[in-house]
């Protein structure tokens, strides 16, 4: 991605919501590499899909020769960002936040190159400059540059101030000052001249731009990526089970892959622009091919492959594809014990059972059937498989060989209704 027209290329992909002084930023980028940053607050023990677009944006800038700084908010994570939040956040303990900082730093690391010469990425933590700052320094050196009149008029907090049932604490109100100072600090430490973030961060970013100008007399810039929405109006990045996480222990690679496979046709080509590094030409060619093929579109599989590989690596992608294929074909011989552990985590409904159970009871306990009577009829009609093999004996008791790896048995009723038995 050539640096001189990087902003234009990001706009073509739909990745720019707002940008400050676009002309001056384009000129600055044309002059040569810059340092830029994006902040990630440890509000949980993992990043989720909402973080992926700004994180990949950092990567796009690095590929164009710029120096990315990934800032994990060890200090701001202790306070909580009120931007567009309906209620006050719960404050987490310092120990919890520190634990989450470590996890998030490890999650961010594979996306960036920390050893590539002059534009090697930097990992930073704002606790390094806030941890030992006393309240008088904070109020005198930072607070005096902020106008409360302007702060209460920022869209991000205005909604909270106007709600009778929910005000805003001084703690959360001061968040804007902390993030603003991050920008000024990174500008001084690493020459950072651009902050990127989600569109909900616009107010915090512009505060940082103003503060950097006041403290260091430097012109810096802000760019926000859009909030990702789906064509049907439902929230992106959520499933029935909640958020889609980047940590494989919270959302398995199989579940992650399936999330992308289930992308609507109305969204898939847009998402290829947001979440992959395919060129616009490649994406347009794929869309044209799908339109004219007369078959199911290929785009969802391309998207699922690309994003799963980015987040979980080749091994995670191959496991996700292997599980998908085995469930589709009914043949489980290729599945490893780790694959079954993914299914048990979140891939299919799971039930724990004591050894010695019979098939009818398993169908009831797994909620594949409402009663033993109904289970008997279903088994007799040849509609039940155990580990891919049909079983038509209603009086069947599980045998040792049904327990794959001594732990797992996969039941299927009909073509698509699965349940995994985990034996106690």
Swiss-Prot record:
Residue numbers binding L-tyrosine: 37, 175, 179
EC number assigned by the record: 6.1.1.1
UniProt keyword annotation of Isomerase present: no
Keywords attached to this entry: Acetylation, Aminoacyl-tRNA synthetase, ATP-binding, Cytoplasm, Ligase, Nucleotide-binding, Protein biosynthesis, RNA-binding
Assigned GO CC terms: cytosol
Top-rank EC class of the record's enzyme: ligase
Sequence positions that bind ATP: 238
N6-acetyllysine PTM sites in chain numbering: 144
GO MF annotations, alphabetized: ATP binding; RNA binding; tyrosine-tRNA ligase activity
Protein family membership: Belongs to the class-I aminoacyl-tRNA synthetase family. TyrS type 1 subfamily.
Function of the protein: Catalyzes the attachment of tyrosine to tRNA(Tyr) in a two-step reaction: tyrosine is first activated by ATP to form Tyr-AMP and then transferred to the acceptor end of tRNA(Tyr).
Protein's UniProt name: Tyrosine--tRNA ligase
Taxonomic lineage: Bacteria, Pseudomonadati, Pseudomonadota, Gammaproteobacteria, Enterobacterales
